[in-house]
């Protein structure tokens, strides 16, 4: 657990960079600090490992005031990942990852063995271990940075915009890898980002900071989206928060629609015989590979005729995933697959909206029933 108690940081006679901050980052969870430039999120992070000293207040880890701890031991017990990885350019990947274990007195063999475990854990090929940072892509360097931070198995991780310097595709991959690793290791993580979408995706709880280091709201992502505390948080979270909140709503057992499908190589007559403007193509494993527009088929179906714009939702996914699949599909029919990626049916946007309405009606009915019970009334005597 990382706890801030009335923490303030000022520089000279200027206004506070962080102002009377009190919050608690729970053990084993990802707590995200997010806010506009100048809100003090990085300053807050750096006060945990005492790269910056608070002007007043206390920062504690598992109940121990960090100001009372030996500085070297404090920092060696905290994993730290920064924006541009910060790797040592003169050391190979394996030696970069082994840095902290070696500082802690591990033998070279033990430290390197641990480093190789982590290189694989973060999704890197073992043969990259002998390369130098300059020989890696930006995404690979960030993975090495995460591996190095985890090398000594620290209970606490600090991550300062670790994925912001890579392209969107790599960023998505790194985020997914990070969530996988966190699910496996359960570190107490304080994560800084300026991107509210990243905060909502990664955080168990999200702290929204105002300029000047004031805490506006600290809540679960779904709470931020459904119930922002004021106009500042509502504006910062975004006008489409209702749609994004659907990512946290588990999809009910929607009845899926049957859909006629074709395989690659289907003839124009076979495609037209389906009787739809758009026909879904599956591969040999029954996985969806794209839609074919019937009017455009003038030869046996090949991959050049496929429209791949639509996303594929999982049957056990969220309402947002189902709605996105329907809205992004060129046919208007969202593709749904089982956990193994095999096609099982389609869903319309109207199906999802109806499911949302049913969920809300059921919630209102439940709340009304609870209110009636609280006053000791049965349904017949309720006002």
Describe each region flagged by the PLM:
Residues 90-98:
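Short coil-to-helix segment of the ABC ATPase nucleotide-binding domain corresponding to the Q-loop/switch region
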Residues 134, 152:
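Conserved signature/switch motifs of ABC ATPase nucleotide-binding domains
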Residues 49:
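Helix-to-loop junction immediately C-terminal to a conserved catalytic motif
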Residues 257-285, 308-367, 373-383:
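The conserved cystathionine-beta-synthase
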Residues 102, 109-127:
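Conserved ABC ATPase "signature" region
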Residues 146:
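Hydrophobic anchor residue at the start of the ABC signature
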Residues 34-36:
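The feature captures the beta-strand-to-loop junction immediately N-terminal to the Walker
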Residues 65-79, 103, 109:
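ABC ATPase NBD coupling module
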């Amino acid at each position: 657990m990382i706890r801030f108690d009335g923490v303030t940081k000022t520089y000279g006679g200027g206004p506070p960079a962080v102002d009377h901050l009190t919050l608690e980052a729970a053990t084993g969870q990802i707590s995200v600090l997010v806010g506009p430039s100048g809100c003090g999120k990085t300053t807050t992070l750096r006060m945990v490992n005492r790269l910056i000293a608070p002007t007043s207040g206390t920062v504690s880890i598992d109940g121990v005031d960090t100001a009372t701890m030996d500085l070297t031991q404090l920092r060696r017990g905290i994993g730290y990942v920064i924006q541009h990885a910060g790797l040592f350019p003169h050391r190979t990947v394996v030696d970069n990852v082994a840095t902290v274990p070696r500082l802690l007195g591990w033998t070279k063999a033990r430290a390197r063995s641990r480093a190789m475990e982590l290189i694989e854990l973060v999704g890197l090929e073992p043969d990259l271990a002998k390369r130098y940072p300059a020989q890696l892509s930006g995404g690979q360097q960030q993975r090495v940075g995460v591996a190095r931070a985890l090398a000594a198995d620290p209970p606490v991780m600090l991550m300062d915009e670790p994925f912001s310097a890579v392209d969107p595709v790599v960023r998505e991959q790194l985020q997914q890898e990070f969530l996988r690793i966190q699910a496996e290791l359960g570190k107490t993580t304080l994560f800084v980002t300026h991107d509210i979408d990243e905060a909502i995706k990664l955080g168990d709880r999200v702290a929204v900071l105002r300029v000047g280091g004031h805490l506006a709201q600290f809540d679960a992502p779904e709470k931020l989206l459904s119930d922002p505390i004021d106009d500042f948080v509502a504006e910062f979270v975004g006008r489409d928060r209702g749609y994004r909140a659907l990512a946290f709503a588990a999809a009910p057992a929607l009845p899926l629609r049957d859909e006629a499908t074709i395989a690659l190589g289907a003839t124009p007559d076979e495609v037209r015989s389906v009787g739809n403007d758009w026909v879904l193509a599956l591969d040999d494993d029954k996985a969806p590979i794209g839609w074919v527009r019937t009017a455009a088929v003038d030869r046996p179906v090949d991959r050049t005729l496929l429209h791949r714009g639509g996303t594929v939702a999982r049957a056990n996914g969220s309402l947002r995933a189902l709605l996105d699949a329907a809205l992004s599909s060129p046919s208007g029919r969202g593709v749904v697959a089982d956990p193994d990626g095999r096609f099982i049916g389609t869903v319309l946007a109207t199906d999802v909206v109806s499911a949302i309405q049913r969920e809300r009606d059921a919630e209102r009915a439940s709340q009304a029933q609870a209110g009636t019970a609280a006053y000791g009334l049965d349904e017949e005597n309720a006002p």
